[in-house]
Amino acid sequence: MIVLFGLAGSGKGTQAKALSEIFGWRTFSVGQVIRDTGEYTDIIDKGGLIPDDDVIKLMNKQIEIAEAEGYEIILDGYPRTEYQAKWLMDHRADDIKGAIVLDVPKEELYNRLALRARDDDKDMESIKHRFEIFEQNIYSILSLFEAKNIPVTHVDGVGTEGEVTDRLVDVVKQLDPSATEQNDDVNGGEIEKSYGE
């Protein structure tokens, strides 16, 4: 299991999808899993956080299904809070090969989000609030990973989608030497431009 972190607009959703296609893994975006329930629209629109226990239940269900089917997993943007991270460390630390953080300057993130069509990306206050929540939580989350000796790698998220994907593929192979490329043509094909959560 690999965990992929990044601010809204960092490209982690796009890159998680690319990695899942390259390695034949499953990827789960915490934002998409939550949106698919249709139960938290008001919170999402304001850039807020869903109750931790609800998120844990939703994500763990997806993880268990993928594991039962024999898939390796990329977690896109989960855990989002220290509480979620503590639960993950208590129950799944041994399954996690490493965490990757996509680093992108905020000016670039604002430009990317301005081009996205999602409703929750149109409100600047909502975007700023999402950035603040991420920054308030990420350091304590990564500290929990490091306390369990789970490698944390920062990757430059600026460049073409293919360039960033190549960097991530190299890191994934370092974190999980058993990772085998299933599809060498992903970078040359069309990857959905979701730019993550």
Stretches found by the model and what they are:
Residues 1-197:
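Glycine-rich phosphate-binding loop of ATP-dependent small-molecule kinases
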